[in-house]
């Protein structure tokens, strides 16, 4: 029988320090977004990335079967994700008591004095969904926006999968291009970095 044992806070800090040192040695600044495998995420990790200068996380993942393929339950159960994370999830502030979107005050604070924000991988990841699945998820969020709800879609694409799934990704991105270029659309669809999405949501929450 195996016993699950998470990384300690000290171990997490050592790994983060190593990662940040690699960025610094190559002349880059401090990265702002941390994407942990959703199954390795924990409150300990979220607190430590906030301490080290990260302002956003991209780990929340829909465990359900509503759209596309599904990981085995053990993957999301390791971290504590549940069906409160769906393809309809939107960015949220991370609570000090849970990594789930159901969390409430107090929130984990970052070095800029604002909350650590989770950007859910609401479009699942590259191999799990078809182009039509991804377009359908995008359309859900467009409808949210038409009702006045702030939202964002995270297209999670692994660098190593870009060539293998090029046709699918190209189809989806062309679809997004068409939405963003439609001057008569009821809502504006635009590409944005995680930092830009976080800034807009913080402004919205205020």
Regions found by a protein language model. Give the residues of each.
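Active-site-adjacent pocket scaffolds in enzyme catalytic domains
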Residues: 35-149
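C-terminal domain-boundary segment and adjacent tail
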Residues: 56, 61, 131-206
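A structural motif corresponding to the C-terminal end of an alpha-helix
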Residues: 18-29, 107-116, 147-148, 179-187
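Glutamate identity and glutamate-enriched acidic tracts
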Residues: 10-11, 44, 66, 77, ...
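Metal-dependent polysaccharide deacetylase catalytic core of the NodB/CE4 family, i.e.
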Residues: 3-43, 60-69, 73, 123, ...
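Short amphipathic alpha-helical segments and helix-helix/interface helices
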Residues: 20, 46-47, 173, 177
